[in-house]
Amino acid sequence: MSYNITSSNQYQYFAAMWAEPTAMLNQCVSALSQSYQTQAARDTVRQQFSNLLSAIVTPNQRFPETGYRMYINSAVLKPLYESLMKSFDTRNRIIETEEESRPSASEVANATQRVDDATVAIRSQIQLLLNELSNGHGLMNRAEFEVLLPWATAPAT
């Protein structure tokens, strides 16, 4: 028994693009209360989001029988998740100085504004993702999944 793959675009469902909905919702809520003043803090939270994703099906392993799973590659969630991941990466854009060891007052002010802008962008993207998850977008159960990718059972003998 296996999934009946009839199109090359169906392989995307076997990738590590799935998350437990409650875990992702909890991560969003937790991340909204975090401080993003350092790149290390942004990297940590980005990694926490990334760690929630896993592969839940293979060509021979069926979608879980109960519950829903979040598919991050859905049309609604993919652009939000990608924007969130990009908003965490402010390395080499926060402080740009003539002399790294002695930034001027205007360079420090500019860097402070960039950190604030990055924090606003991160929180905004998290809130957008949280809103869509709360509305049930990108969630699938076995029945919905198997409409997209039918499970082929062995013929009865």
UniProtKB/Swiss-Prot annotation:
Matching entries from SUPFAM superfamilies are given as: TMV-like viral coat proteins
| Claim: Transmembrane helix is one of the keywords in the record | no
In the record, N-acetylserine modifications are located at: S2
Q: Which UniProt keywords apply?
A: Acetylation, Capsid protein, Helical capsid protein, Virion
Q: Which domain of life is it from?
A: Viruses
Its GO CC terms?
Answer: helical viral capsid
Q: What is the annotated localization of this protein?
A: Virion
One MF term in the entry's GO annotations = structural molecule activity
Gene3D superfamilies xref list: Tobacco mosaic virus-like, coat protein
Main subcellular location: virion
Keyword Nucleotidyltransferase recorded: no
Family recorded in the similarity comment: Belongs to the virgaviridae capsid protein family.
Its function? Answer: Capsid protein self-assembles to form rod-shaped virions about 18 nm in diameter with a central canal enclosing the viral genomic RNA.
Give the protein name, as stated in the record.
Capsid protein
Organism of this sequence: Ribgrass mosaic virus
> Which lineage do the record's taxonomy fields give for this organism?
Viruses, Riboviria, Orthornavirae, Kitrinoviricota, Alsuviricetes
Q: Which gene encodes it?
A: CP
